[in-house]
Amino acid sequence: MLEHGGKLREAMQRYGGSDWIDLSTGINPLGYPAPAPRPDAWQRLPEPDPALVRAACDYYGAPDLFPHLLPVAGTQAAIQALPRLRAPARVSVSAPSYAEHAHHWSRHGHTLRQVPYAALDAAVRDSDVVVVVNPNNPTGATVAPDQLLAWHAQLAARGGWLVVDEAFGDTAPALSIAAHADRPGLIVLRSVGKFFGLAGLRLGFVAACAPLLAQLEDLLGPWAVSGPAQEVALAALGDRDWQQATQARLKHDGERLRALLPAGASGTPLFHWWPEARPKAFHEHMAQRAIWVRLFRDAARGIRIGLPVHEAHWQRLEHALREWNQG
């Protein structure tokens, strides 16, 4: 299994203490106040709710996308399944980015290349599938929608796919190309867990042409998304007041975090990453102060930090960073 953020229990076991600050993920730390599901949401088999899909279409600014949107148990479910829907192919994955993409395309017999963002344009010419994380996790790198659609046109002309992972796209809606996902060969992944702070819900969406969604749905099987998850997501996707207030708060907090970090830091309102020269030492320094950050050891060698929740947590983070810089 690949390494991810979280795993706070392991940190506590290793370093001791209980008053930890978990900044190791890019998940909104002040998530949506989930309502209690109705009793029958627990009792009945969870058939897909058309109202949830309509709410998602409205939220993503694509009201005509209804036949082209499939709820799934988190974007991870789609990431694991999509490579099984193609014969062995030449696959280029943006790098560094969310490692599960490369892992699963490689695992299912495809010829994999990990391609820096600056080289993606050239990679499209001799690839059957191109996977782009936009905005990128962990670096925050972005690709303009017009460029993505141009790449899709090249790939689709020869039966290829463009897979765009927009899991962190809620804070940058202008980057989304989900509204175009009725086009054959374009697949867009959206997450409810990140912006809404509902990672435990395990709910996301795949936007794609109807025939491909039918294949994906068949592969994932019936009752892929629980009834309680559908009810909570329906409320969250329709709560415009909460969404607007959260966008403003995340923008403010993201700028505050960025101001604390080195000049080379980049990211999104939910997290920032930088190519720390001594990432293991930094990670250890923070852990000794009961602050859990994300250490990247390989292609994205560096550190990613998410947002603190409370002012006291901000103060602890600032103090720990000041000690590191003075050391």
Show which residues each predicted segment covers.
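N-terminal "arm"/small-domain region of PLP-dependent enzymes with the aminotransferase-like
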Residues: 1-58
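Short glycine-rich anion-binding loops that position phosphate/pyrophosphate groups of nucleotides
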Residues: 26-32, 134-139, 169, 194
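PLP-dependent enzyme catalytic core of the Aspartate aminotransferase-like
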Residues: 144-146, 288, 298-327
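A general structural detector for well-ordered alpha-helical segments in enzyme core domains, enriched
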Residues: 147-151, 177, 257, 282, ...
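PLP-dependent aminotransferase class I/II
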Residues: 185-265
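Conserved PLP-binding catalytic core of the aspartate aminotransferase-like
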Residues: 260-289, 295-298, 307, 311
